[in-house]
Amino acid sequence: MNNKEPHTPAIQLWVDDPSEEPPKGWLLCQNAFRAIEILQGGQVTRISLSYHLGQEEHVGTGRDVLLWILGALSMGFEPPEIGVHCRVPSQRQSLLAAVTQIDKLHYAP
């Protein structure tokens, strides 16, 4: 899976609920499933996630996005730079643990 197409505009994807304004230049995505669709387009160079996006059964979580990235690595997906901006300590730790797994698999020799 080649997700880095030449000559495509870069996207910085901010995955969070509507109460959080993204930094200037970042695209706000309030739905984990939509975030995954955007990632599949191959234009995302940076992604920053919060855990809670709204009602989980309807919009998923930031962790769902990271688990998708983790699974897509085996198909050749090149992950973007990943950040976590979640403020809830337990949820932040869950996201960071998934990022660590992604880093280990992606950068393993």
Predicted regions mapped to residue ranges:
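Catalytic phosphate/metal-binding cores of nucleic-acid and nucleotide-processing enzymes, i.e., regions
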Residues: 1-109
